[in-house]
A protein has these predicted regions:
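Short Pro-Gly-centered flexible turn/kink motifs
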Residues: 25-42
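TPR/TPR-like (Sel1-like) alpha-helical repeat modules
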Residues: 268-274, 282-308, 334-338
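Short coil turns that delineate tetratricopeptide repeat
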Residues: 169-170, 203-204, 237, 271, ...
Length: 349
């Protein structure tokens, strides 16, 4: 699966849907249970590598002799009460505090807790402002120079946020920011704009500018989004994530010169980040500075961007845009002359 014949790699994936591209809506208060078994099996090559339906039937028949389906169902029934619903005797790893926060919210609302047999611990530092909101009706002070520790797009917190913002925390930029972000996730753009404008008036803060940029992106206003994204990066010049976000927004708005100026103003250690170098190459292609862009992409045997996501096509798109302009050809013809290098091609097909 890695694409390199010299790499020994196997990946096991399982789920209820047929493929990764599908999803199954899960109704509230529903439990889905299943049991999986993994192991080796032998079968005749002629059967396994023959027609699909025949191969499928051969594998199913062989598996039925190794571990019958009814045996799996029996094990599932047996373990439902003896294991799945039994409180743990030893805790090996503590998870995040979000489950604990939800149990706290449920207790305040008079609702039953999450799975009572599970130990969700207590809310931690990330959940501290939300715990304070539940218990005291106020999130408390927050340093605008520090990254926002958490966001909670849960409509059930909206009334609490609104009450705090209109009352005891009317001068608290962080409460207004969280209210604006929550409204944004609910599609209430006009209300979100008002809340974020209030937050922006209370503090010069990268995270407020970031949220304002997201608002304008969602409203298909790339130029306004770019203004706030640039301001966010200027307010947090040492933050790599803000710089990467700002560059993406500027490039989407085709403000290539602004993107290069932002990179030039960044600290050297951020300028050298592979994702920033990729954005620089993209901006250079947009400005027809093709040799400079190609030099970045091909440096040291080819640019490697560790934080690129599976299926993300940014690298291949930048490469092909460069080749189209370089040769003056349509995309397909340019790719025949200069195919996307192996190290840059993350396309799924």
């Amino acid at each position: 699966m890695s694409g390199n014949p010299h790499d020994r790699y196997i990946e096991i994936q399982a789920g209820l849907a047929q493929t990764q591209y599908e999803c199954l809506p899960m109704p509230p208060h529903t439990a889905w249970e299943w049991l999986e078994a993994y192991g080796a099996m032998n079968a005749g090559p002629a059967q396994i590598h023959g027609a699909w339906h025949g191969a499928q039937a051969a594998v199913e028949a062989r598996l039925e002799t190794l571990i019958p389906q009814e045996r799996l169902e029996q094990l599932l029934r047996q373990t439902r009460d003896t294991m799945a619903k039994r409180p743990a005797q030893a805790l090996f790893c503590r998870g995040s505090g979000w489950g604990a926060l939800e149990n706290l919210r449920r207790a305040h609302a008079g609702e039953p807790p999450l799975s009572p047999q599970l130990d969700f611990g207590v809310p931690g530092a990330e959940q501290a402002p939300w715990r304070a909101l539940l218990e005291r009706g106020a999130m408390g002070e927050y340093d605008p120079r520090e990254p926002v520790s958490s966001w909670l797009p849960d409509a059930r917190y909206l009334p609490l946020l609104a009450q705090a913002a209109q009352g005891a925390e009317r001068e608290n930029w962080h409460t207004w920011l969280q209210l604006g972000a929550a409204l944004l996730t609910q599609g209430r753009f006009a209300d979100a704009r008002d809340a974020l404008a209030r937050a922006d008036s209370l503090a010069r803060c990268a995270w407020v500018k970031y949220a304002c940029s997201c608002l304008h992106l969602m409203q298909h206003e790339p130029e306004r989004a770019a203004v706030y994204a640039r301001q966010a990066a200027e307010a947090a010049p040492e933050d790599a994530s803000v710089l990467k976000f700002a560059l993406r927004v500027l490039l989407e708005a085709r403000q290539y010169g602004e993107a290069l100026r932002l990179i030039a103003a960044a600290p050297p250690e951020l300028q050298r980040l592979p994702r920033v170098r990729l954005s620089e190459a993209q901006a250079l292609v947009g400005l027809e500075r093709l040799e400079e862009a190609e030099a970045i992409l091909l440096q040291d045997g080819g640019l490697i961007v560790p934080d690129i996501r599976e299926g993300e096509q940014t690298m291949s798109e930048v490469w092909l845009a460069l080749q189209q302009k370089k040769y003056g050809l349509e995309r397909e013809a340019a790719e025949k002359i200069a195919p996307v290098p192996y190290r840059m091609d993350f396309r799924m097909n």
